[in-house]
Amino acid sequence: MARTKQTARKSTGGKAPRKQLATKAARKSAPATGGVKKPHRFRPGTVALREIRKYQKSTELLIRKLPFQRLVREIAQDFKTDLRFQSSAVSALQEAAEAYLVGLFEDTNLCAIHAKRVTIMPKDIQLARRIRGERA
């Protein structure tokens, strides 16, 4: 129950306080939202930290295979039409792409921490790439 500011009042008689106690008891026994229980919510950041631990423990690929394969084929079409890929080649490309992204996000996080922030921003990614020498 939310706290409210209490002001001093004159007591008018013996019956008023008893009535007030009865209403308080009734308020406590019945939920304020009409019997509908609110779903449990974790504090901001708790779920994010849990997900970080979960994904740092795991080794499986995080990008879905078919969308990544479509992207690879779409990019390859710009260089040569009717290219064929072995499934192991697409898997190797996906492993390399995910390893690159994980490393980039690690460096990006360090840039954000260096700027005394916990939230990464596009400028952190740009700085990380610039320091790596990927982008002049």
Curated annotation (Swiss-Prot):
Acetylation is generally linked to gene activation. H3K14 is only found as H3K14ac (20%) or H3K14me3 (14%) and H3K18 is only found as H3K18ac (13%) or H3K18me3 (16%). When modified, H3K23 is exclusively under the form of H3K23ac (5%). Pre-existing H3K9me or H3K27me limit the possibility for histone acetylation. H3.1 shows a much lower level of steady-state acetylation than H3.2. Increased multiacetylation after exposure to NaCl. H3K9ac is restricted to euchromatin. GO terms for molecular function: DNA binding; protein heterodimerization activity; structural constituent of chromatin. Residues 1-43 are annotated as: Disordered. The modification Phosphoserine is found at S11, S29. The modification N6,N6,N6-trimethyllysine is found at K5, K15, K19, K28. The modification N6,N6-dimethyllysine is found at K5, K10, K28. The keyword DNA-binding applies. GO terms for cellular component: nucleosome; nucleus. Its main location: nucleus. The modification N6-acetyllysine is found at K10, K15, K19, K24. The modification Phosphothreonine is found at T12. Keywords: Acetylation, Chromosome, DNA-binding, Methylation, Nucleosome core, Nucleus, Phosphoprotein. It comes from the Eukaryota. SUPFAM superfamilies: Histone-fold. The record marks K37, K38 as: Not N6-methylated. Pfam families: Histone. The record marks K37, K38 as: Not N6-acetylated. The modification N6-methyllysine is found at K5, K10, K28. It is found in: Nucleus; Chromosome. The nucleosome is a histone octamer containing two molecules each of H2A, H2B, H3 and H4 assembled in one H3-H4 heterotetramer and two H2A-H2B heterodimers. The octamer wraps approximately 147 bp of DNA. Core component of nucleosome. Nucleosomes wrap and compact DNA into chromatin, limiting DNA accessibility to the cellular machineries which require DNA as a template. Histones thereby play a central role in transcription regulation, DNA repair, DNA replication and chromosomal stability. DNA accessibility is regulated via a complex set of post-translational modifications of histones, also called histone code, and nucleosome remodeling. Belongs to the histone H3 family. This is Histone H3.2. The gene is H3-1.1.
